[in-house]
């Protein structure tokens, strides 16, 4: 039986509370981060566009925590595979557009030096016990990812397919804001100790570039880079995105709109996970036993004597 906990967001505490912060405190932190971008800049606009979806993401993350994100390897690794699929699609398109078409935005994004897909792959190989022996391992990795995607929701599949078909740096910037930003700006670094406790240090390659000294500088560089993406066209009063077929979209607006859609896509990936944690059967058994005892106690005395 599949757990419905991953979609019943009203049945569990908010993610903010699970981390020791109220939803209001989390909102204040989000707003404080937003203000680190330039006034009327792209970073602030992207943050504002995902505000509501980010609140939903916190709640969904809380559901995943309750469902076993940091207590059951099977739950964690399925989440990792889904986000790997999206991230790998994005980074593959970035490299292709930079190399084949000289896309300036992709060039700027890649200049940050991040490539999370290979790190995801190392962790997936560890989490699924895939021997690192070259081509056979890569084939096993591909098969493992395909199996997870096969049982994912239609929304998750559609989100990944959308990224695979992105044709401009403006679209990929919106995806990067959500998929990279969650690790660089968000709680990636804070998740590492819990992941290491559950899965071991060999499953923590994903956090290599977002932990350790220089975290504040990495955040600042990410924010400044986003604010710079459309600054030239803004200064020149030429906002039309010539990378798009319609010729009418503004790069600034296109990135913000794509960012908003990708945040919803990230949430779709989280709702796609439906694995029961290993400990659920024990919780259920205990609950059933408790209910049975309570029910027996409240039976009329005559009925209790006959049982």
Label every PLM stretch briefly.
Residues 2-307:
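Metal- and O2-centered redox machinery and metal/ROS homeostasis
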